[in-house]
Amino acid sequence: MSQVTARVLNSGMRLPPLPTIRELVKLYKLQAMKQLSQNFLMDERLTDKIVKSAGRIDPRDIVLEVGPGPGGITRSILRRQPQRLILVEKDRRFGETLQLLRECASPLDMQVDIYYDDILRFNIEQHIPDTTQRIHLIGNLPFSISTRLLINWYADLAARRGAFRRNDTCMTLTFQKEVAERICAPVGSEQRCRLSVMSQIWTEPVMKFIIPGKAFVPKPQVDVGVVKLIPLKQPKTQLPFSLVERVVRHIFSMRQKYCRRGYGTLLPPDSREETTQTLFQRADVRDTLRSFELSVPQCLRLADAYAEYIKEHPEVEAYDYRGPKNPDVSGAAAASS
């Protein structure tokens, strides 16, 4: 860090004055695009609160922001002065606005990198090869990709790859209020679903606060929840992510019925009832519970039981209850039971 920059930071000087986000939107004739699920957050008190929810951001840290748009949250991040800020934005219309923010950050020795890319395809590991610096993931997520992105990141977290090669990469993200509540839903809650269990296997999700829809432009028909997801230091399972995700997805496919109904669809019909009962006994889980009444340990014991079963009957792993009937798989499983 240069002596000039040190003096700037020590003096408490802030970023140079910029047009407000509302002025920038008007200046560049920016309009939110429905197909990109865009909603702009104009209130800097709220963007500051989102970034504050991420916790301490040190001068050596890297922040990756998803979908900065006109730069509301971006400005709040820059005030925290990370060493590097990576912006991943799919919509090139925001280029001039984001370039202006980069120029304002440059005198303070903050590196701002802008990538016009789809976060679902963005290779974080390629752009952040160094694992000595802590990473924060922050974003006002488009509603249309939020669940898919989160599941992708959980897969990375389970494999210790991408942004999660260290075990301290926290995610501070916005979701539709209903989705945010599902992520954090406890056992027995009517809102508990696949996303609840997957989130709670690999992270500790914390609902930070709710933003009313009227704070966004254009105003969405729903309120928004800000959730911080803190990776667990010790994972709750060593099973492959894909297997756990498959089992949990099947369990919750019939969430209002007894959990054995959804779980049973993992198995060919010829041996389904008997095998399902056996696996529930192995897992020490009552099969008359409904899926939203299952705890994370119970779901993982059911995943363990299924993993052991497909070791004994490898042909069952390929079974897909939605596909065409496969007498070879059903017959083989029944014969070997």
UniProtKB/Swiss-Prot annotation:
Q: Which SUPFAM superfamilies match?
A: S-adenosyl-L-methionine-dependent methyltransferases
Q: Does the keyword Amino-acid biosynthesis apply?
A: no
Source domain of life = Eukaryota
Q: Name one GO molecular function term.
A: rRNA (adenine-N6,N6-)-dimethyltransferase activity
List cellular component terms (GO): mitochondrial matrix
Binding residues annotated for S-adenosyl-L-methionine, in chain numbering: 38-41, 67, 89, 118, 140
Write one Pfam family the protein is assigned to.
Answer: RrnaAD
Q: Which Gene3D superfamilies match?
A: Ribosomal RNA adenine dimethylase-like, domain 2, Vaccinia Virus protein VP39
What EC number(s) is this enzyme filed under? 2.1.1.-
According to its UniProt record, this protein's enzyme class is transferase
Which residue interval is the transit peptide? Answer: 1-84
Q: Which GO terms describe its biological process?
A: mitochondrial transcription; transcription initiation at mitochondrial promoter
SMART domains xrefs: rADc
**Which keywords does this Swiss-Prot/TrEMBL entry list?**
Methyltransferase, Mitochondrion, RNA-binding, rRNA processing, S-adenosyl-L-methionine, Transferase, Transit peptide
Purpose of the protein: Probable S-adenosyl-L-methionine-dependent methyltransferase which specifically dimethylates mitochondrial 12S rRNA at the conserved stem loop.
Q: Which PANTHER family match?
A: DIMETHYLADENOSINE TRANSFERASE, DIMETHYLADENOSINE TRANSFERASE 1, MITOCHONDRIAL
Q: Which family does it belong to?
A: Belongs to the class I-like SAM-binding methyltransferase superfamily. rRNA adenine N(6)-methyltransferase family. KsgA subfamily.
Q: What is this protein called?
A: Dimethyladenosine transferase 1, mitochondrial
Species classification? Eukaryota, Metazoa, Ecdysozoa, Arthropoda, Hexapoda
